[in-house]
Curated annotation (Swiss-Prot):
Positions with a binding annotation for Ca(2+): 778, 780, 789
Name recorded for this polypeptide: Alpha-actinin-4
UniProt organism field: Bos taurus
Modified residues (Phosphoserine): 696, 909
Gene name tied to this protein: ACTN4
Location of Phosphotyrosine modifications: 31
Its job: F-actin cross-linking protein which is thought to anchor actin to a variety of intracellular structures. This is a bundling protein. Probably involved in vesicular trafficking via its association with the CART complex. The CART complex is necessary for efficient transferrin receptor recycling but not for EGFR degradation. Involved in tight junction assembly in epithelial cells probably through interaction with MICALL2. Links MICALL2 to the actin cytoskeleton and recruits it to the tight junctions.
Oligomer status and interactors: Homodimer; antiparallel. Identified in a IGF2BP1-dependent mRNP granule complex containing untranslated mRNAs. Component of the CART complex, at least composed of ACTN4, HGS/HRS, MYO5B and TRIM3. Binds TRIM3 at the N-terminus. Interacts with MAGI1. Interacts with PDLIM2. Identified in a complex with CASK, IQGAP1, MAGI2, NPHS1, SPTAN1 and SPTBN1. Interacts with MICALL2 (preferentially in opened conformation); stimulated by RAB13 activation. Interacts with PPARG and RARA. Binds to VCL; this interaction triggers VCL conformational changes. Interacts with SEPTIN14. Interacts with IGSF8.
Residue numbers spanned by region Interaction with VCL: 12-26, 40-61, 108-126
PROSITE patterns, alphabetized: ACTININ_1, ACTININ_2, CH, EF_HAND_1, EF_HAND_2
Molecular function terms, GO-annotated: actin filament binding; calcium ion binding; transcription coactivator activity
């Protein structure tokens, strides 16, 4: 006889859901005792026997096909015991003793006894079933034995709300078919004759396979065939009964129906487990993939930013000087373009990088994953260090550019200064030689000679004054030579020409003075009068010009005191006008006296005073102008006085309202701070109270609008200060915005606490206890605890973190969870996250391993085909690409290790 173990050694099966021995859902004796009532009539009805044969044969073949074989005749094919032992191995997932190879009756009996002993070892009492009857092909005993196997391995573990196997299966059917019309499952015979119950079970779990609304209760054959064909085609449940056998039997066989229905139960319960396991894996993988994308984005952004810094620093450290200011200015323009165009996006990238890093760490912490550690050299601190190096190089580069530009500007300034002074000097000397050589004094009158002498004296003074300019020109030329100015040759040529011309002017000046002194005579009186006129006319003319400027000066005042000061000064000015008028008349009298002397002595005057250009006509014209401006000034000052009085009224009006609104805002800010600390009642009560408080604040807005209207009037009046109040409109606006922001932030904090409480299943009492403990140790009300404050808070909540080695280790572990960035502060949200993790369940690596084990059919490995069948395509490929090959002794080609993959997801091993 062929050894079936050797023939099927390539097939290995994991234990099924019903292979846990006698310990699943009650003892075998209990349900067998219950089944005694079902087997009272040992003489099978022929119709029932036919149904049992077909059902039991199909049920056995549904399992034997896994081992590559099947049976045709149920009471013949099990006689040698070989396929019976193989069936038990497949459905139990356990090895039976090695079968005997002989073909004699004794060998067959021994093989059947091995199978019966295995059944008995599972707690099954075999009543009146012996190996000899099975070997002899006793149909009744064979069907009874198969029914016992079905009960033990397919129905026993079905338990709904602690019911027995049969009752549990019936209750499951009733619940699944309850929503369907014309279906009322009360038993496992009559309730199934019309086929609607079978169709309802399929539609409940796979609605796309059955159009239930089109089925008719009066067409049972069609209904049954439809259900059996769909189950065989799409659910892998073989056809165990014929529709005609069920319909043509007054009471279908209960065992056959139970066997058929149990196949539906196992098909749908297995699919549900697989779906649950797949959903759990998908959820875990989705979180892991999202985190990996964030990590990749961080690495890419960090690399790009560090590369940009690496390229930019050498450019900023380049200190090669240029020869011209235009070249240096181009460098400065490039630097400004860098500051204006290139750097700001990088500043934004750096900020976004830090935000992404913090967001990633938060997501990892919330999903119970290890903290993200960037590649070496790409930490946030590394980027900050590189950025500081960039800033230092940038600062030094700017200083160097400015120093170089200042140096070149000094050279250009010196050269320009030389050109300007040289041009002024050359313009001044233009015509001077011709003037000094002119012999106009030979035919001049006495007054002309006097004028020429004075003019020559003035020229000599001017000449002496220009001596400094000539010396400066020479000094600048010397400095340009020392600094190696590129145009030194032209500078030296021009400087030499100026010096030669200067010497010639000195010689000509001396000669002309000697000639004028020889002719200096006559008529000093007229000359003295002209001089006296000039001395007094010039100051008086200046006084009138200053007075006209003051009278026409635009004044800007902001207070009544300032305008009253201007009015007082103007009154004082008007009191000086009589004295000024007398001075004017005295000056005009001097001019008239000179005219009288010249006429009486027949002296021909040149017509103008040689000492001044201020004529009597100019003095009279300006005096009339002053007389006209005085009343205009009076009118303007009075108008301004009226305006300032109106402004003072606006100031007082604004101050009165501001001194009410400002303290109100400050009081509300203090009350919000107190409310956020006390936080009495439930979170919902706190939220409701805060929102009512927010509405009371919003209702106060009309007072602020009134203040805005008053402020608008002040702005239109160009009033810039107000001594009647310390509150400015900007101060009020900032306070108002801070008030709205504070109440909104406080409301948001409570809403987040509610979300955290609901998401983590934290009770109201726990949340209040957490808030009370946190507030108690938050001494400065800053919203965060330091390490010592946090430790004291944990101790108050019962955590063993005392000052010993074990307590310190536990505290350091907790700090690494709540403060992964080592900032030294623990926020209330981080505190709540930690406490919620400590008090609620989270997904673990063991849960993921258990889920994969379900998908793998309880094997220690999983195949790519199984992953693609149970998971979405993208996540299936993700797992296949990352799972290591399985190396266990039971490995098959293509086996993948899902255990190491699952632990790697949670940082417990390397992926």
């Amino acid at each position: 006889m062929v050894d079936y173990h050797a023939a099927n050694q390539s097939y290995q099966y994991g234990p099924s859901s019903g292979s846990n021995g006698a310990g699943g859902g009650g003892t075998m004796g209990d349900y067998m005792a219950q089944e005694d009532d079902w087997d009272r009539d040992l003489l099978l009805d022929p119709a029932w026997e036919k149904q049992q044969r077909k059902t039991f044969t199909a049920w056995c073949n549904s399992h034997l096909r896994k081992a590559g074989t099947q049976i045709e005749n149920i009471d013949e094919d099990f006689r040698d015991g070989l396929k019976l032992m193989l069936l038990l191995e497949v459905i139990s997932g356990e090895r039976l003793p090695k079968p005997e190879r002989g073909k004699m009756r004794v060998h067959k009996i021994n093989n059947v006894n091995k199978a019966l002993d295995f059944i008995a070892s599972k707690g099954v009492k075999l009543v009146s079933i012996g190996a000899e009857e099975i070997v002899d092909g006793n149909a009744k005993m064979t069907l009874g034995m198969i029914w016992t196997i079905i009960l033990r391995f397919a129905i026993q573990d079905i338990s709904v709300e602690e019911t027995s196997a049969k009752e549990g299966l019936l209750l499951w059917c009733q619940r699944k078919t309850a929503p369907y019309k014309n279906v009322n499952v009360q038993n496992f015979h009559i309730s199934w004759k019309d086929g609607l119950a079978f169709n309802a079970l399929i539609h409940r779990h796979r609605p796309e396979l059955i159009e239930y609304d089109k089925l008719r209760k009066d067409d049972p054959v069609t209904n049954l065939n439809n259900a059996f064909e769909v189950a065989e085609k799409y659910l892998d449940i073989p056809k165990m009964l014929d529709a005609e056998d069920i319909v043509n039997t007054a009471r279908p066989d209960e065992k056959a129906i139970m066997t058929y229905v149990s196949s539906f139960y196992h098909a749908f319960s297995g699919a549900q487990k697989a779906e649950t396991a797949a959903n759990r894996i998908c959820k875990v993988l989705a979180v892991n993939q999202e985190n990996e994308h964030l990590m990749e984005d961080y690495e890419r952004l960090a690399s790009d930013l560090l590369e940009w810094i690496r390229r930019t620093i050498p450019w900023l450290e380049d200190r090669v000087p240029q020869k011209t200011i235009q070249e240096m200015q181009q460098k400065l323009e490039d630097f400004r373009d860098y500051r204006r165009v290139h750097k700001p996006p990088k500043v934004q990238e750096k900020c976004q990088l830090e935000i992404n890093f913090n967001t990633l760490q938060t997501k990892l912490r919330l999903s119970n994953r290890p903290a993200f550690m960037p590649s070496e050299g790409k930490m946030v601190s590394d980027i900050n260090n590189g950025w500081q190096h960039l800033e230092q190089a940038e600062k030094g580069y700017e200083e160097w550019l400015l120093n170089e530009i200042r140096r070149l500007e000094r050279l250009d300034h010196l050269a320009e200064k030389f050109r300007q002074k040289a041009s002024i000097h050359e313009a001044w000397t233009d015509g001077k030689e011709a003037m000094l050589k002119h012999r106009d004094y030979e035919t001049a009158t006495l007054s002309d000679i006097k004028a020429l002498i004075r003019k020559h004296e003035a020229f000599e003074s001017d000449l002496a004054a220009h001596q400094d300019r000539v010396e400066q020109i020479a000094a600048i030329a010397q400095e340009l030579n020392e600094l190696d100015y590129y145009d030194s040759h032209n500078v030296n040529t021009r400087c030499q020409k100026i010096c030669d011309q200067w010497d010639a002017l000195g010689s000509l000046t001396h000669s002309r003075r000697e000639a004028l002194e020889k002719t200096e005579k006559q008529l000093e009186t007229i000359d003295q009068l002209h001089l006296e006129y000039a001395k007094r006319a010039a100051p008086f003319n200046n006084w009138m010009e200053s007075a006209m400027e003051d009278l026409q000066d635009m004044f800007i005042v902001h207070t009544i005191e300032e305008i009253e000061g201007l009015i007082s000064a103007h009154d004082q000015f008007k009191s000086t006008l009589p004295d000024a008028d007398r001075e004017r008349e005295a000056i005009l009298a001097i001019h008239k006296e000179a005219q009288r002397i010249a006429e009486s002595n027949h002296i021909k005057l040149s017509g103008s005073n040689p000492y001044t250009t201020v004529t009597p006509q100019i003095i009279n014209s300006k005096w009339e102008k002053v007389q006209q401006l005085v009343p205009k000034r009076d009118h303007a000052l009075l108008e301004e006085q009226s305006k300032q009085q109106s402004n003072e009224h606006l100031r007082r009006q604004f101050a009165s309202q501001a001194n009410i609104v400002g303290p109100w805002i400050q009081t509300k800010m203090e009350e919000i701070g107190r409310i956020s600390i006390e936080m009495n009642g439930t979170l919902e009560d706190q939220l409701s109270h805060l929102k009512q408080y927010e509405r009371s604040i919003v209702d106060y807005k009309p007072n602020l609008d009134l203040l805005e209207q008053q402020h608008q009037l002040i702005q239109e009046a160009l009033i810039f200060d107000n001594k009647h109040t310390n509150y400015t409109m900007e101060h009020i606006r900032v306070g108002w915005e801070q008030l709205l922001t504070t109440i909104a932030r406080t409301i948001n904090e409570v809403e987040n606490q509610i979300l955290t409480r609901d998401a983590k299943g934290i009770s109201q009492e726990q949340m209040q206890e957490f808030r009370a403990s946190f507030n108690h140790f938050d001494k400065d009300h800053g919203g965060a605890l330091g390490p010592e404050e946090f430790k004291a808070c944990l101790i108050s909540l019962g955590y063993d973190v005392e000052n010993d080695r074990q307590g310190d280790a536990e505290f350091n572990r907790i700090m690494s969870v709540v403060d992964p960035n080592h900032s030294g502060l623990v926020t209330f949200q981080a505190f709540i996250d930690f406490m919620s993790r400590e008090t609620t369940d989270t997904d673990t690596a063991d849960q993921v391993i258990a889920s994969f084990k379900v998908l793998a059919g309880d094997k220690n490995f999983i195949t790519a085909e199984e992953l693609r069948r149970e998971l979405p395509p993208d996540q299936a490929e993700y797992c296949i690409a990352r799972m290591a090959p399985y190396q266990g002794p039971d490995a098959v080609p293509g086996a993948l290790d899902y255990k190491s993959f699952s632990t790697a997801l949670y940082g417990e091993s390397d992926l």
